[in-house]
Amino acid sequence: MGKRYQSLIPTIILYLATFQALAQTAWLDLQRQNPDLQLQTFESANLTVTVLNTQTVTAAPRGTVIILPDQQQHAFSPHLINTLRLHLPNAGWNLIILPAPDTLPDQAAEQRLQLQKTQLSQRWQLIQQQGNLRPPVIAIAQGEVAAVLRALLSEDLTNQPAAMISLGAYLSDYEQHKQTLSEYASVSMPFLELITAHDHPYAMATIEQRISLAIQTNNPLYRQRFFADAHHNASMQQWFTNEILGWLKTNGF
């Protein structure tokens, strides 16, 4: 680890402890509203993560989907995440939904991104080690979390997913966001990127560059779908769910 990151370690440890407390409170609030919520807690020496863990109702599970919501989102968010929560177990997938990450608005861009990577990497490894996940493991990540996970896949993330689905990926710092563009199309696993006109403006601002990069690289593992007229209504959410399930089947999952 470089010297510029060593100075961040005490801050990262403090923030991670704060995140765990906030995430636990959010799950308890959801559980009070939904008493049948199936929660599972994973613990290590310095990390505790509580997740929603739903097993498929089918006799032959297809694998495990891990959903990583964006900030201020959760398993019951009234858009695509909630629709996936309801439909994926019926389609044969065991489902784990992580709590959304928390960040502080006054962080410098470099510190924020490093903190996001550290938190997400630690959570991912803990779930992989203790979750007894049925393979293949598919990651569905949303918004800024999707961009952070994609960056980790280009670095040293162990126990990588078999495939990833990215929903409106962006980084809150625009310069960092632009720097990650070239990474999206150069994937070594099946990768589906879904972007709509209702996603973050940064995701929209670079859509043409992403399309051009996809054409230039001609990577058969990378697929992108952009929907200019997409709306977050029930029929569109169902359409997106069917698009995801169809893509998974096309790739042999």
Question: What is each residue range found by the language model?
Answer:
Residues 56-93:
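Short, surface-exposed "cap/lid" segments of acyl-processing enzymes
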Residues 24-58:
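N-terminal cap/lid segment of alpha/beta-hydrolase-fold proteins
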Residues 106-132:
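Alpha/beta-hydrolase active-site loop
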Residues 140-150:
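Gly/Ala-rich beta-loop-alpha elbow adjacent to hydrolase catalytic centers
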Residues 218-253:
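C-terminal catalytic histidine-bearing segment of alpha/beta-hydrolase fold enzymes
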Residues 158, 163, 168-223, 227:
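The feature captures the conserved acid-bearing segment of alpha/beta-hydrolase catalytic domains
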Residues 18-20:
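N-terminal signal peptide c-region/cleavage motif recognized by signal peptidases
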Residues 136-139, 163-165:
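Residue in the alpha/beta-hydrolase core beta-strand immediately N-terminal to the catalytic nucleophile
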